[in-house]
Amino acid sequence: ITDAEALVRHGQMNCISWIIGHMANQEQTYWLLLGQDKLLHPNLNSLVGTGKPASTPPLAEMLDVWYSVTNETDDYLQTVIPELLQTHFVYKGQSRPESIGTMLYRNIYHYWFHTGEAHAIRQMLGHTDLPQFVGNMQAAVYKPEV
């Protein structure tokens, strides 16, 4: 998509650049702030957080934010073992209501929701020959834990 296309809002739908920033915001909140007490982009939630006013942030900026956040969160998520999934983060002295495993599910489902939204936006923009699957389905096969 072009920079201009990334800012297009159709009715109440978010724009693609917002979606990218919004996903970075959830990962930053879950895996950096709650998981490690780190905050790379302190103003991100006010720009693209749930329930905040609609915004159309620049695509390049949101991609930079997303890459910086996901690089940090990937390092953290590599340390999450099955036993941790049933535990809860403690933030500011309070145990979070959802387990880490539930938060991981929520993060995955959230990506799928907004991936679908971005796909619909691209269709509305007139893009053709869009992918039918995310990733290489031949190589993405289930492998049981050892």
Label the predicted regions.
Residues 51-91, 98-113:
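Acidic/histidine-rich alpha-helical segments that form the ligand environment
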Residues 2-6, 82-85:
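Short, flexible helix-adjacent loops and helix caps
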Residues 3-49, 91-146:
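Short, contiguous alpha-helical
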